[in-house]
Amino acid sequence: MNQNHTILQNLPVGQKVGIAFSGGLDTSAALLWMKLKGALPYAYTANLGQPDEDDYNAIPKKAMEYGAENARLIDCRAQLAHEGIAAIQCGAFHVSTGGIAYFNTTPLGRAVTGTMLVSAMKEDDVNIWGDGSTYKGNDIERFYRYGLLTNPALKIYKPWLDQQFIDELGGRHEMSEFLIANGFNYKMSVEKAYSTDSNMLGATHEAKDLEFLNSGIKIVKPIMGIAFWDENVEIKPEEVSVRFEEGVPVALNGKEYADPVELFLEANRIGGRHGLGMSDQIENRIIEAKSRGIYEAPGMALFHIAYERLVTGIHNEDTIEQYRINGLRLGRLLYQGRWFDSQALMLRETAQRWVAKAITGEVTLELRRGNDYSILNTESPNLTYQPERLSMEKVEDAAFTPLDRIGQLTMRNLDITDTRAKLGIYSQSGLLALGEGSVLPQLGNKQ
């Protein structure tokens, strides 16, 4: 093995190789293949609270059956909840369509998985890591970055980048036949019209039929909630209250949760009953090619709505503007696998210190169907929203008088005069036509 190469293109025979093991066809076949070819596979499974996983404890047992030297289940749920709350606090969501956001649930899961699994491998003196990400996607770069951040001595071996593996087991049928030929009664599951990846924060549905934009959200079977577009699915309006303390969600419907994992699970149940947080997005992958995904994130959506309501009621306009600008930038860094880079930590610390710390209060909403909701009440000891300041009724001790406003408007004459002068300059240079038919038809041609 060339010690100068971080990415290994051939199986490191006789050496320990860690594999992120899901128990599915791909990783099962890869683990057995590596074992038979002479490597020493170690299996690591992340418990991320995936809504479509029934029995986590069975996965390491399955890995041992396929030939793993050792198999470990790593509980990542508490850390995932922590990072999910941090993303809410920072508004770290840069992909949206029509005001409906993608909550970066897969990038958050990769940040946790990539660091915690490699850390567990270090404990076992395993310094070679493989996972199931393909060369066309985002995850190959995310895992690469997080893995090397956690263990600078790490080497990467991916069977899906090994030509020998591809030649021998290049497809699902070949992998299934390989397992059967080696004495494993593997029954290949019915292939869906799309691929699904999930964790406690959300689910991603993509690829196959969803690569075509004429295949809509209706072909997806939600795993975290209901198909809100189906008129046969009865959805009753439901009131829900969300309480924050210093930027952290702590209670739902008056019930406090000491465990953030349980808090997220309950938020998912509430939002999922309505299909809240589902979206259809076209996004730019890290390599600048566009992809399309259908996303679920009922709990994240519920917390985001309540959090932003409190943000707008507590903070001033400039703070809100900076929160949004920084959130867009931080969302991109998170998406790119840079959640723990210094530039991301700087943006996170800013939002968590100067925005989130003031967010204490409770928001009550009515959830209906899909992303249809109403805000019914907003309460906080930190609200700067004071209706008496702008009341249309006569009030005593008014915050300002008509004379105060006259003075304020008079001061505006300074920049209005400057603006008219600039428009005149633009007109004289031919950049802007004034008068009839122009974009500013009423200004005339005189300065």
Curated annotation (Swiss-Prot):
Give the protein family. Belongs to the argininosuccinate synthase family. Type 2 subfamily.
Instruction: Please cite one Gene Ontology biological process associated with this protein.
Output: urea cycle
What protein does this entry describe? Argininosuccinate synthase
Where it mainly occurs, coarsely classed, is: cytoplasm
- Where along this sequence does the record place binding of L-aspartate? 134, 138-139
| CC terms in the record's Gene Ontology section | cytoplasm
Print the keywords alphabetically: Amino-acid biosynthesis, Arginine biosynthesis, ATP-binding, Cytoplasm, Ligase, Nucleotide-binding
From the UniProt record, which GO molecular function terms apply?
A: argininosuccinate synthase activity; ATP binding; protein homodimerization activity
Identify the residues that bind L-citrulline: 102, 138, 142, 195, 204, 206, 283
EC number(s) of the enzyme?
6.3.4.5
Q: Which Pfam families match?
A: Arginosuc_syn_C (PF20979), Arginosuc_synth (PF00764)
Pathway annotation: Amino-acid biosynthesis; L-arginine biosynthesis; L-arginine from L-ornithine and carbamoyl phosphate: step 2/3
